[in-house]
Amino acid sequence: VSAAGDRLQDTARRAALALPDVSHGYPFTPGLDVYKVAGKVFLIVTDDPDEQIITVKCEPEHACAQERAYASITPGRYLDKRHWISLGPGPGITERLVTDAVEDSYDLVAERLPRRDRPSAR
């Protein structure tokens, strides 16, 4: 079952808030809900009914594979297009895929933090 835009965003928000030591807010613009771990961004949810996307960090080789596999996964909006991908509603974009993308992004960011700043194990 494909995740519609609002469900995609709600799923991403729920997945992010279930992770340890996550904060979120609107530091850039009122339309971008930004999720961070230890002050580092791992998820951006676009609050725009005409462009219901999420943007997550991704290993470059995995990002390329995802972009080839799904038409609604594109290089990351707003950020380094090599290390970030944006997911929009479309065929194959399931709640499980969204949750996995958010969790993978969190893990990528958390593992690069100095040991003292890393969240407790999840």
Regions found by a protein language model. Give the residues of each.
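Charge-dense, helix-prone N-terminal extensions
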Residues: 1-122
